[in-house]
A protein has these predicted regions:
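Noncatalytic, solvent-exposed loop/strand surfaces
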Residues: 1-169
C-alpha cells in the first residue's frame, strides 16, 4: 500500500498534474492500532508536503489525512476515509485510532474512533469502514491564495459532538 498512490493505483487521479511523482510526506503520522482478531491495522495518515500550500499538488490528494485500514499480513488496503480533502492546514491525524466495542441502536459493534486536530471524532465500523453516524460533506469557503484550489467541501461528523469549540471569534 502506498500512502501516495502511484500511477495506475487506486486514488492516483486525486493527485492532479502528476503531483504524486514529486510530493512527499503523507506518512503514518502517529502510532497505528491493530485488531489481532480481524487481522487489520489502522493507520492515521499525515499531511502531504507542503503542509500549508497545495498549489503544486492540486486535487483531493488521497490518502493524505485519511484513516486507512490495511490487512496486517499483506498490507492490502481494505478501506479508508479521508478526513480532510486537499489539506492546507496541517490537519493530519494526531493520535492513534482507538478500538472500541460499542452498542448502537441495541446492537454490538466493533468500532474504531479517530480524533482530529479540528476537534472532531470520526467513528467507523472496524470491519467495513462505514461511518457509525452520518458524516456530512459541507461546502467550505474557497481559497484566495494565488495558485491554490481548495476542495469545495470537507467532511463533518454529526456525532459525537466536537470536543473543541468550532468557529473563529
Amino acid at each position: 500500500f502506498h500512502t501516495i498512490p502511484q500511477a495506475g493505483e487506486y486514488g492516483n487521479e486525486t493527485w492532479e498534474n502528476g503531483s504524486s511523482e514529486y510530493t512527499g510526506n503523507t506518512n503514518s503520522w502517529t502510532i497505528m492500532s491493530a485488531d489481532d482478531e480481524l487481522g487489520l491495522v489502522y493507520i492515521p495518515i499525515g499531511t502531504p508536503t507542503n503542509d500549508w500550500y497545495g498549489g503544486k499538488r492540486l486535487g483531493d490528494n488521497l490518502f493524505a489525512e485519511s484513516l486507512v485500514a490495511v490487512r496486517a499480513d499483506t498490507g492490502e488496503r481494505v478501506w479508508h476515509f479521508q478526513t480532510v480533502h486537499h489539506g492546507l492546514w496541517d490537519y493530519d491525524l494526531p493520535a492513534a485510532p482507538t478500538l472500541v466495542d460499542i452498542t448502537v441502536d441495541g446492537r454490538p459493534l466493533k468500532a474504531v474512533a479517530q480524533i482530529s486536530k479540528q476537534g472532531f471524532t470520526y467513528v467507523f465500523d472496524r470491519i467495513t469502514g462505514e461511518p457509525v453516524w452520518p458524516i456530512e460533506e459541507r461546502a467550505v469557503p474557497p481559497s484566495s491564495v494565488p495558485g491554490e484550489v481548495a476542495s469545495p467541501t470537507q467532511p463533518f461528523p454529526t456525532k459525537p459532538a466536537p470536543f473543541e469549540p468550532q468557529g473563529i471569534s
